[in-house]
Amino acid sequence: MINKIDVSLLRSIMLGIWQFMIHLKQRITEDQINMRAGHLAYVTLLSLVPMVAVTMSMLSAFPVFKGIRSHIETFIYENFIPSAGDSVQMYINEFVANASKGTAVGIGALVVVAILLISNIDKSLNGIWRTTEKRPMVVSFSMYWMVLTLGPVLMGASLVATSYVVSLKLFSGTDLSGVVPLLVERLPMFFSVATFLLIYMVVPNTKVKFFHALLGAIVAALLFELGKKGFALYLTEFPAYEAIYGALATIPILFMWVYLSWIIVLIGAEITAAMPEYLDKRLMDLVNKELADDESEIHLDEHKR
């Protein structure tokens, strides 16, 4: 009896997952996330240098982050841009150095372009959530500015805290001595989950449940880690782009990776947005089934009378 219940429960869970995957596929097709990702990748490449310039300017404004700029750059390029990180870092740093020599008007233009990227992310994600109500202009600008200013500071603070924990000798000689290096090794994964969770909770102009956002963030982070390893493997085993483009190979490689990254971000957003829709649909199906069963019982009783 117990085995039959277990098999029935497992079958019901698997059927539910399969139905959710069908619903998710339909949603992804309707939203054309490949086109959205292409648009965001294009805007990201235009905004990449301004975003990095603004980020580094914010970090340099705080003395506590003065000595860790190079560590932050290395951490980002090694963990979030696979294989071609060194060449990308060299070019972007050169572009940022040139941009920082500009006038106040030029630097202001960089900030505007950086805000343009955040605005496009906002519109794309709210399109996935089917939200028609727009935020007031003041609220939107405040949110974009908060991302530009607080984002780099929080990232720097996280890395400083991690470096401090690693430098402590609190766990040396204990059973936990091997835990800290393991946590540090998983740090990019934790950052990815936290970043995706923040995006899926804050950006949509609608209420998003924490569990739904967490599920989407975990799936997106796992896909991101797999994507990094797969993309790095492709570049090392099949170096066709370097053979064709030579010194310019960094450009299409970077575009491909940014495009793939946005596909992953949007898939996580689709999962987060699809969860409440699917659960509501399941609930309605159960209610309708119960009503149908009640009606059939009533008709049966009337027939017996």
From Swiss-Prot:
Entry's Gene Ontology cellular component terms: plasma membrane
InterPro entries reported in the protein's UniProt record: UPF0761_bac (IPR023679), Virul_fac_BrkB (IPR017039)
Subcellular location(s) per record: Cell inner membrane
Record field: transmembrane: 45-65, 102-122, 137-157, 179-199, 213-233, 247-267
Domain of life of the source: Bacteria
Keywords: Cell inner membrane, Cell membrane, Membrane, Transmembrane, Transmembrane helix
Membrane topology: Multi-pass membrane protein
Annotated Pfam families: Virul_fac_BrkB (PF03631)
Assigned protein family: Belongs to the UPF0761 family.
Protein name (database record): UPF0761 membrane protein Shew_3545
Lineage, broadest ranks: Bacteria, Pseudomonadati, Pseudomonadota, Gammaproteobacteria, Alteromonadales
